[in-house]
């Protein structure tokens, strides 16, 4: 309640797709909405590593939208081969399956976060992502969204960087 008239927005790190039922430890989208949450992260790499599938992520997106939340959909590859193109196919598959049954009006309410798992600070043998990597993937994500929803709709979707950033590179990511 104290945040209601502030410029601060509240977000949650996870959501459950069922509205109610015997799901101990899970928090529904409606419960998050009722306590004033605005945003919810869906499809984070750590959740995927625990077995969360694209189909479950799709259910979470739909549930979050129905409850009036703004979902932040994380997509990204676990490794990036220099020439194999596999990383592109991974992101295309994630978007295609996670956004199944999402309408043009609904996609405009979703934030897409590019989260390169290989660049996260918690990943063993990680290496740095560059603003160029993000720029390339942002263009690719926008193309996939254009294929799925049309250019005008795709251009209205917010795409952000969700990997490791620091004081030295944050400005470069913000300029993309």
Model-predicted regions and their roles:
Residues 1-176:
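Active-site loop-to-helix "anion-binding N-cap" substructures in soluble metabolic enzymes
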């Amino acid at each position: 309640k104290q945040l209601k008239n502030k410029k601060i927005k509240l977000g949650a790190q996870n959501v459950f797709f069922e509205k109610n039922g015997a799901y101990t430890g899970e928090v529904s989208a409606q419960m998050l909405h009722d306590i004033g949450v605005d945003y919810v992260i869906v499809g984070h790499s750590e959740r995927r590593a625990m077995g969360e599938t694209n189909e479950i992520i799709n259910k979470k997106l739909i549930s979050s939208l129905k409850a009036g939340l703004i979902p932040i959909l994380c997509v990204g590859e676990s490794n990036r081969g220099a020439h194999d193109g596999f990383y592109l196919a991974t992101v295309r598959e994630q978007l295609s399956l996670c956004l199944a049954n999402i309408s043009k009006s609904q996609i405009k309410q979703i934030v897409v976060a590019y989260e390169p798992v290989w660049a996260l600070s918690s990943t063993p043998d990680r290496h740095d992502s560059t603003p160029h990597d993000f720029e390339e993937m942002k263009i690719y994500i926008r193309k996939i969204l254009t294929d799925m929803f049309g250019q005008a709709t795709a251009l209205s979707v917010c795409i952000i960087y969700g990997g490791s950033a620091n004081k030295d590179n944050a400005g470069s990511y913000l300029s993309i």
